[in-house]
Curated annotation (Swiss-Prot):
SS bond list: C32-C57, C33-C73
Leader sequence segment: 1-23
Protein name: Eotaxin
A GO BP entry: negative regulation of neurogenesis
UniProt-listed CDD domains: Chemokine_CC
Source species: Rattus norvegicus (Rat)
SUPFAM superfamilies named among the record's database cross-references: Interleukin 8-like chemokines
Domain of life: Eukaryota
Pfam families: IL8
Amino acid sequence: MQLSTALLFLLLTATSFTSQVLAHPGSIPTSCCFTMTSKKIPNTLLKSYKRITNNRCTLKAIVFKTKLGKEICADPKKKWVQDATKHLDQKLQTPKP
């Protein structure tokens, strides 16, 4: 009887730890960039972007999403990347008529 009680306790403890880990999926990056584009992407092709700054990723990057749904990694230190993110920020803030 004591053995089954101890096993039940261990099972419940393990389950509670598992649910706590799964409750924080935001701490795990969904993607990391390993290479970055060397070509400038025209603003007319860009739809959105996200910043990859997680410590688990080797490179800090901007991931642009194009109007065709393609994701492209770019170096956030490049001037064209900074200009493109500013353009997208302004575009998203401007209300459409």
